[in-house]
């Protein structure tokens, strides 16, 4: 069998010798579900020629805006833009943010061609302001293109996708930064052991998670990245989150209990990804990625929107040139020891709690709203101090020195919308926890068991109405601070899986169904805890307890301090 016919940009000696043009020569399937399965299984991965054909077809079928540059545009402009300069000395566009062009298996001519294509893309897409993933995409596509012009056209179609349901590549700092925050949120929910390690070894976990796209678009070897890209072209952006989460899981598995190779975990992960072949095959990496039962694309999009909104509100929409690359994550702020004092938790314990909260609120500083030692043991005073703040953090210390609490996504003023009756409200971002005698967090049961529900459209769920006790705000959900995991987006088997928080004159309740995660009386004197369906938790402390102290904390924008 003849070796595959590589183009003039590829160093055939670097290409995987196992990839011969064996097996199928054409792809005849047209059904999306079948195409997904074939992509995940690597149907065209062992044929260089077939992969090139599949890329051509999949990219041709991307819905694009009306005016999308094609190969003829490249032929017209490349001479004017490049001039007589040597392609190897051409500068990279500013929007790649000093990202190095991965060479993969390109020869010197191929490396220069990538630079030419990137400059021509910059000429045709002046609206792209931040796109560090693009060099890797262009470099990969060049392996499977007839010439530079065809590669240019493919990249332009990916950038010009106008299907609102199929996000492909971040093209602004706001989109990139919010994606990093979203990835951090997903790690917090789906890779808790790895997240705990990151918190322990890094001063700034968001800085570590902000490197996630580089793991895929730059550090992964070509045969791994191409397999990811195969599925990405069929399924979209969510695949990238899946694979990055799988990488982090494998990193934790290999490194757990071992000393890190350096004091820079960010660099350690990069090296791990670069040498990932020592740990796991491309097939096993994808198998792990698709074994993670993520929420729907719609729910992830809601979270992304919430993170973008938080960044916009703080005026963070472009990268600040005055910030050095090593300090790029100026948006992430830790709990400052000098400004923090609690009667219940230490600075370290508060930082641990902060590592659990959604990334868009980790940008804030803790603000003491209520302290039973300052404001008295009164539930009505507790509500008064907390109203107008969303989210809040509830901390309880018992007379036995046990410490537990809850992160509560919704303003306590929502309790007044039930006509004096006790009604549940909140979203699936709520969670309960204990800190003493040992640390344990319990999230919404649907996060660990998504099979309990299927995401449904907001329109259909509103049309059908709801029989649950969850409050429905009249304001536009897009304007709410916590749209992510709102119960109205899910078909729940019973209302007990969504009893997040409730408050009346005589008591405060967190979690419901089969029991209550936390119940506190109106005098903030006595409480009880037990298993509940909403969080599937164990008792957070002694089942019946006396309260020594209660605190409620809000989230303050550092710019308003």
UniProtKB/Swiss-Prot annotation:
The Rab-GAP TBC domain is essential for phosphatidylinositol binding. Residues 343-556 form the TLDc domain. The modification Phosphoserine is found at residues 475, 482. Interacts with ARF6. Gene3D superfamilies: Ypt/Rab-GAP domain of gyp1p, domain 3. Coiled coil: none annotated. The lineage of its organism: Eukaryota, Metazoa, Chordata, Craniata, Vertebrata. It is found in: Cell membrane; Cytoplasm; Cytoplasmic vesicle membrane; Presynapse. Signal peptide: none annotated. The gene is Tbc1d24. It comes from Mus musculus (Mouse). May act as a GTPase-activating protein for Rab family protein(s). Involved in neuronal projections development, probably through a negative modulation of ARF6 function. Involved in the regulation of synaptic vesicle trafficking. This is TBC1 domain family member 24.
């Amino acid at each position: 069998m003849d070796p595959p016919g590589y183009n003039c940009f590829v160093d055939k000696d670097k290409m995987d010798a196992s990839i011969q043009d064996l097996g199928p020569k054409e792809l005849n399937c047209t059904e999306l579900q079948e195409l997904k399965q074939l992509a995940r299984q690597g149907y065209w991965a062992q044929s260089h020629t077939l992969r090139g054909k599949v890329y051509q077809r999949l990219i041709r079928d991307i819905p694009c805006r009306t005016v999308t540059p094609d190969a003829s545009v490249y032929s017209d402009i490349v001479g004017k833009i490049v001039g007589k300069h040597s392609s190897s000395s051409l500068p990279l566009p500013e929007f790649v943010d000093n990202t190095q062009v991965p060479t993969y298996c390109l020869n010197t001519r191929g490396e220069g061609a990538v630079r030419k294509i990137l400059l021509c893309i910059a000429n045709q897409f002046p609206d792209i302001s931040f796109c560090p993933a693009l060099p890797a995409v262009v470099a990969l596509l060049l392996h499977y293109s007839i010439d530079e012009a065809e590669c240019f056209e493919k990249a332009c179609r990916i950038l010009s996708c106008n299907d609102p349901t199929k996000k492909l590549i971040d093209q602004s700092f706001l989109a990139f930064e919010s994606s990093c925050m979203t990835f951090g949120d997903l790690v917090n929910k789906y890779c808790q052991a790895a997240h705990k390690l990151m918190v322990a070894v890094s001063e700034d976990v968001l800085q570590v998670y902000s490197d996630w796209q580089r793991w895929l678009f730059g550090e992964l070897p070509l045969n791994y990245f191409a397999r990811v890209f195969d599925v990405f072209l069929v399924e979209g952006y969510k695949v990238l989150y899946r694979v990055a989460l799988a990488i982090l899981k494998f990193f934790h598995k290999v490194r757990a209990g071992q000393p890190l190779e350096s004091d820079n975990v960010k660099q350690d992960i990069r090296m791990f990804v670069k040498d990932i072949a020592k740990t796991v095959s491309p097939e096993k990496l994808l198998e792990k990625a698709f074994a993670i039962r993520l929420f729907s694309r719609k729910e992830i999009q809601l979270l992304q929107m919430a993170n973008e909104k938080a960044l916009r509100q703080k005026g963070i929409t472009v990268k600040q040139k005055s910030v050095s690359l090593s300090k790029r994550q100026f948006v992430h702020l830790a709990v400052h020891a000098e400004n923090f004092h609690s009667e219940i938790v230490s600075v370290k314990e508060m930082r641990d709690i902060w590592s659990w909260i959604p990334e868009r609120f980790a940008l804030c500083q803790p603000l003491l709203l209520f302290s039973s030692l300052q404001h008295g043991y009164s539930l009505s005073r507790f509500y008064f101090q907390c109203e107008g703040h969303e989210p809040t953090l509830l901390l309880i210390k018992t007379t036995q020195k046990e410490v537990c609490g809850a992160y509560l996504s919704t303003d306590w003023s929502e309790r007044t919308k039930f006509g004096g009756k006790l009604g549940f409200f909140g979203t699936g971002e709520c969670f309960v926890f204990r800190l003493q005698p040992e640390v344990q967090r319990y999230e919404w049961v649907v996060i660990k068991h998504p099979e309990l529900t299927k995401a449904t459209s907001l329109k259909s769920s509103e049309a059908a109405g709801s029989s649950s006790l969850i409050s429905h705000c009249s304001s536009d959900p897009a304007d709410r601070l916590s749209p992510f995991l709102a119960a109205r987006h899910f078909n729940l088997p019973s209302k007990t899986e969504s009893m997040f928080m409730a408050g009346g004159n005589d008591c405060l309740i967190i979690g419901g169904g089969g029991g209550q995660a936390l119940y506190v009386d109106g005098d903030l004197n006595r409480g009880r805890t037990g298993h509940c369906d909403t969080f599937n938790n164990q008792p957070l402390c002694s089942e019946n307890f006396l309260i020594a102290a209660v605190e409620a904390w809000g989230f303050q924008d550092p710019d308003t301090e």
